[in-house]
Amino acid sequence: MSSLSPELYGCLGNSGLKVSKLILGCMSYGKKEYWEDWVLEDEEEVFKIMKAAYDAGIRTFDTANCYSAGVSEELVGKFIRKYEIPRSSIVILSKCFFPVRKDLIKIFGDLSSRGVHFLDSPELANQCGLSRKHIFDAVEDSVKRLGTYIDVLQIHRYDPHVSAEEVMRALNDVVESGKVRYIGASTMRCYQFIELQNTAEKHGWHKFISMQNYHNLLYREEEREMIPYCQKTGVGLIPWSPLARGLLTRSIDANEETIRSKTDLYTRALEFGAGYKAILSRVEELAKKYNVSMATLATAWSLHKGDYPIVGISKVERLKDALAAVELKLSEEDIKYLEEPYCPVPIQGEI
């Protein structure tokens, strides 16, 4: 049995669920045709990365039903069966909200060109959002693809068309069904999250134990309301894209070199404040000072904030950069130096 560092684990918020402080993001694994060109399709390579992460102690995997039209979830399930991973030793986070379609990118583009929001689209009726019907259908399908239960089911976004009572009752019921152990949320306004939590509290239903929000050195708007609220109420923070879609891993001049930086639709839509270049320069400077990669430095900042960041690993060799972040202890002076150039930016990540 391998020796795993206690430093790599912690409870998710006030819950008793222990997760690895680094969470393996599985959006990168699936099919290019169903998602984007930077997705890793080779199953054996995907399993090699997952096994290396698992052996190193990263035993919490984050996926979603919509990633590559469900292929990402299928790969997580196949990995568990291929290596006969004890189910009790791994934590699976998945999500529901978006449609699960092989033509998802195309249909979103078509609807956008017609000025129709996907939640209002007749073609996607009951295939997205947070209605009781869709939540139940999504959980049934995810459990089939995974071949097992979901440890934390996260609502991918807030649905303004469905009442808080309907959403939280449905989530409570899927937990009571045994197909889901806990519930979490992702990317919404703080007042929306509070409304949902208060509704669950009022009725004695299961509440969210985690918030998966967009938070990194280039985007810190969540520090105004959402993060303080979560910290105050014991909700665990598991930020997605702690490396800002890879932008925090390379110097400014190198940021147009990867397939992802050239083709990722979300990356191209990002907006950065006036301090963007200064922040990247300081990340690069401190990375050299500590003799680590920029990815390690940026991930260490996230860990310092008390977050359990979701890390995307596209090659086994990159795993060491993520693990090194757990060992790297930044000083308060380092943190201040990294954060100082930040300037406010528009709210991002919402639908």
UniProtKB/Swiss-Prot annotation:
GO terms for biological process: potassium ion transmembrane transport. InterPro entries: AKR_Detox_Biosynth, NADP_OxRdtase_dom, NADP_OxRdtase_dom_sf. Keywords: Cytoplasm, Nucleus, Oxidoreductase, Phosphoprotein. It comes from the Eukaryota. It is found in: Cytoplasm; Nucleus. The keyword Nucleus applies. The modification Phosphoserine is found at residue 113. Its EC number is 1.1.1.-. GO terms for cellular component: cytosol; nucleus. The keyword Nucleus applies. GO terms for molecular function: oxidoreductase activity. PANTHER family: ARYL-ALCOHOL DEHYDROGENASE AAD16-RELATED, NADH-SPECIFIC METHYLGLYOXAL REDUCTASE-RELATED. Belongs to the aldo/keto reductase family. Aldo/keto reductase 2 subfamily. This is Putative aryl-alcohol dehydrogenase C977.14c. It comes from Schizosaccharomyces pombe (strain 972 / ATCC 24843).
